[in-house]
């Protein structure tokens, strides 16, 4: 990815994987090594926060039941609705994704310009996000362990996690589509070694 107003190249790496599979951990390790991290979910989160700039649109799409006693959007209620209703999830994504993409482009053109950027995107291959990347990475993790980690981290039921997984491509398909694979089926030290090797490879591609 070449910046139009500068000869300095921004190298964009999209990273994805199964929910609870270690994407954020791998991203954090790569940030420690020198990458600039951008989390797509964090960018999207502001649009379902209590001070959401698209509150009216959210209520029109999902109903007033998503509001709490103070009239603010409740992210847990939103998740319960959309992850059990593919049509509403698709419409929510159509509403939020263009806004997130605009925020993302602004970061690329300012603070991330000329850097190796690791872009954490759960729906990297389900959307056109992968087409923007210079390289794509899928984190390979044990499915059952990933589910258990998500249950523990998010304090949700297994059926809720499975509903979210159902709205994504199978891990096997994400692995097929990726340029690189990060194995996360051991401890944190083994993942760190995987990240170190990947970083070295990608640095060579960038230079």
Curated annotation (Swiss-Prot):
Disulfide bonds: none annotated. Pathway: Cofactor biosynthesis; coenzyme A biosynthesis; CoA from (R)-pantothenate: step 5/5. Its main location: cytoplasm. GO terms for cellular component: cytoplasm. It holds the Pfam family CoaE. It comes from the Bacteria. One of its GO terms (molecular function) is dephospho-CoA kinase activity. ATP binds at residues 20-25. It is an enzyme of class 2 (transferase). PROSITE patterns: DPCK. The keyword Nucleus does not apply. It is found in: Cytoplasm. GO terms for biological process: coenzyme A biosynthetic process. Its EC number is 2.7.1.24. Keywords: ATP-binding, Coenzyme A biosynthesis, Cytoplasm, Kinase, Nucleotide-binding, Transferase. Transmembrane segments: none annotated. Catalyzes the phosphorylation of the 3'-hydroxyl group of dephosphocoenzyme A to form coenzyme A. This is Dephospho-CoA kinase.
């Amino acid at each position: 990815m070449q910046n139009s107003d500068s000869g300095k190249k921004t190298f964009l790496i999209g990273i994805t994987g199964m929910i609870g599979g270690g994407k954020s951990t791998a991203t954090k390790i790569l940030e420690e090594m020198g990458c600039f991290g951008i989390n797509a979910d964090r960018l999207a989160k502001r649009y379902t926060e209590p001070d959401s700039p698209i509150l009216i649109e959210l209520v029109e799409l999902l109903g007033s039941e998503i509001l709490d006693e103070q009239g603010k959007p409740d992210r847990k209620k939103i998740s319960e609705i959309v992850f059990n209703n593919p049509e509403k999830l698709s419409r929510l994504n159509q509403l939020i994704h263009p806004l997130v993409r605009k925020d993302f482009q602004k970061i690329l053109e300012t603070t991330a310009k000329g850097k190796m950027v690791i872009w954490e995107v759960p729906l990297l291959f389900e959307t056109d996000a992968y087409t923007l990347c210079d390289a794509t990475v899928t984190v390979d993790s044990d499915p059952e362990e990933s589910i258990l980690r998500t249950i523990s981290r998010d304090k949700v039921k297994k059926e809720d996690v499975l509903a979210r997984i159902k709205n994504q491509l199978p891990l096997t398909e994400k692995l097929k589509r990726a340029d690189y694979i990060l194995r996360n089926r051991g401890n944190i030290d083994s993942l760190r070694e995987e990240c170190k090797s990947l970083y070295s490879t990608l640095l060579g591609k960038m230079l």
